[in-house]
Amino acid sequence: MIASTGKTNLLGLTQQEMEKFFDSIGEKRFRAGQVMKWIHHFGVDDFDAMTNVSKALREKLKACAEVRGPEVVSEDISSDGTRKWVVRVESGSCVETVYIPQGKRGTLCVSSQAGCALDCSFCSTGKQGFNSNLTAAEVIGQVWIANKSFGSVPATVDRAITNVVMMGMGEPLLNFDNVIAAMHLMMDDLGYGISKRRVTLSTSGVVPMIDELSKHIDVSLALSLHAPNDALRNQLVPINKKYPLKMLLESCRRYMSSLGEKRVLTIEYTMLKDINDKVEHAVEMIELLKDTPCKINLIPFNPFPHSGYERPSNNAIRRFQDLLHQAGYNVTVRTTRGEDIDAACGQLVGQVMDRTRRSERYIAVRELSAEADAAPVAVTRT
């Protein structure tokens, strides 16, 4: 466990919170903007490096405040350029952050919790259970660490990180306040200045918090659907028993409508061999989503040992995609990235594994995938 210093961690404070902090120590509010730029634009965690701040104020800040991100345990780089950081948070748990480069775009996949309580049956993160919510500093700290790793300072110039998705470990809407604060920092010009269209929150379907979301922020929304009917989704995504599909999709439509723009819901659908990849599932999905403006992202399952699931054949994936296309949907198939460093979708487990264990796991993944049809899939990259 990382020992607490008792000082105020400025890393996770929004502009409004930072201004209140400077009020509380008897300083002018404009200091908030100065300090935020040093922290987020330049990656500075040493008050003495803040050269446009008076020495007296720097000494005052050192006495009562700090800039402290999660502890970097390891950084791995995949053969395809994907990067994964394992970071330790104050609770002592480890979480993972993944960067996916693609042309001029670089997407950072950020975790919101250590572990996850939702226990989706095909997700390795859920297998470890729930450990703790991350603080706002620990959520935005993942962006801060990645940005510094790329040397992208100031953060708004020639940025490596163009998009952020809250699709890492955990259910973001079950850590609502801290995730909202972190997303505001992602979009704030004093933070990382990322467009609201390029910040996406992914949820498994916590309906009351989807309804609450529009009161606080207007980021893009992705729904982890994974099944076209309640009976199957109850098995794959147990929270569906509490918030079934009709209720869930209604809440998503309300949120998208509240944005007042031509923005659509992203549907995420992990494809599992002989479970949810059949023609009848595609037909059900077409009917289910007919009143929901959306784009669909098909995610071939990334196997992990003892999951009990397999990746569908390429023919099955292509057939499913074609049926949805023919019905008029915009459909993409997600390219698996970072599989050799356990950074692929559904593989994030927050464990610090030695090289031997990682190699064994990678071999197991390849063996589980061996039966998949070798025919190429026509992939539209997102």
UniProtKB/Swiss-Prot annotation:
E.C. number(s) listed in UniProt: 2.1.1.192
Gene3D superfamilies: 1.10.150.530, Aldolase class I
NCBIfam families, per database record: rRNA_mod_RlmN
Residues that, per the record, bind [4Fe-4S] cluster: 116, 120, 123
Keyword annotations of the record: 4Fe-4S, Cytoplasm, Disulfide bond, Iron, Iron-sulfur, Metal-binding, Methyltransferase, rRNA processing, S-adenosyl-L-methionine, Transferase, tRNA processing
Any single GO BP term: tRNA methylation
Record's catalysed reaction(s): adenosine(2503) in 23S rRNA + 2 reduced [2Fe-2S]-[ferredoxin] + 2 S-adenosyl-L-methionine = 2-methyladenosine(2503) in 23S rRNA + 5'-deoxyadenosine + L-methionine + 2 oxidized [2Fe-2S]-[ferredoxin] + S-adenosyl-L-homocysteine; adenosine(37) in tRNA + 2 reduced [2Fe-2S]-[ferredoxin] + 2 S-adenosyl-L-methionine = 2-methyladenosine(37) in tRNA + 5'-deoxyadenosine + L-methionine + 2 oxidized [2Fe-2S]-[ferredoxin] + S-adenosyl-L-homocysteine
GO cellular-component term (any): cytoplasm
Cited PANTHER family: 23S RRNA METHYLTRANSFERASE, RADICAL SAM CORE DOMAIN-CONTAINING PROTEIN
Stated family: Belongs to the radical SAM superfamily. RlmN family.
Name of the protein: Dual-specificity RNA methyltransferase RlmN
